[in-house]
């Protein structure tokens, strides 16, 4: 019988990336934090749902803070020190996620709001009546 070789999962090589860009997409239902290098290749990411929150709790500021801390921890392992922050969306976790990145030890050089605003494009969905 042939000996079975234990196959380990593909290990990402530890890259030394000193500068990067943090994309925070904050909606009313969830917050997604992606950390990329300056050319746009994703180094680490996290979201409120991936951090263990379900349902309505994903939209809370605390869930955004937890997601940002998890993504920042992995980026610091890759050697990241300075970041630019691009925030998109109207959600509750915007400021909390930025604060969590700062507390994690990343130096923020720029904060930019890149929320898409229509110049009167598509018709809005009809108003909810509860």
UniProtKB/Swiss-Prot annotation:
Gene Ontology terms, cellular component aspect?
Answer: ribonucleoprotein complex; ribosome
Q: Which family does it belong to?
A: Belongs to the universal ribosomal protein uS11 family.
Pfam families from the UniProt entry: Ribosomal_S11
Q: Which UniProt keywords apply?
A: Ribonucleoprotein, Ribosomal protein, RNA-binding, rRNA-binding
Extract the GO molecular function terms from the UniProt entry.
rRNA binding; structural constituent of ribosome
Q: What is the protein's given name? A: Small ribosomal subunit protein uS11
PANTHER family reported for this sequence? 40S RIBOSOMAL PROTEIN S14/30S RIBOSOMAL PROTEIN S11
Q: What does this protein do?
A: Located on the platform of the 30S subunit, it bridges several disparate RNA helices of the 16S rRNA. Forms part of the Shine-Dalgarno cleft in the 70S ribosome.
On assembly, the entry states:
Part of the 30S ribosomal subunit. Interacts with proteins S7 and S18. Binds to IF-3.
| Source species | Prochlorococcus marinus (strain AS9601)
Gene Ontology terms describing biological process: translation
């Amino acid at each position: 019988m042939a000996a079975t070789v234990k196959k380990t999962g593909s290990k990402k090589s530890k890259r030394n990336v000193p500068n990067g860009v943090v994309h925070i997409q904050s909606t009313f239902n969830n917050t997604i934090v992606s950390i990329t290098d300056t050319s746009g290749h994703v180094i680490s990411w996290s979201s409120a749902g991936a951090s263990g929150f379900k349902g309505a709790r994903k939209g809370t500021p605390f869930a955004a803070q937890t997601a940002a801390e998890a993504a920042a921890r992995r980026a610091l392992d890759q050697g990241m020190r300075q970041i630019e922050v691009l925030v998109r969306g109207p959600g509750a976790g915007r400021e909390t996620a930025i604060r969590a990145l700062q507390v994690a030890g990343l130096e923020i050089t720029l904060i930019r709001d890149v929320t898409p605003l229509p110049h009167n494009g598509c018709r809005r969905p009809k108003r909810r009546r509860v």
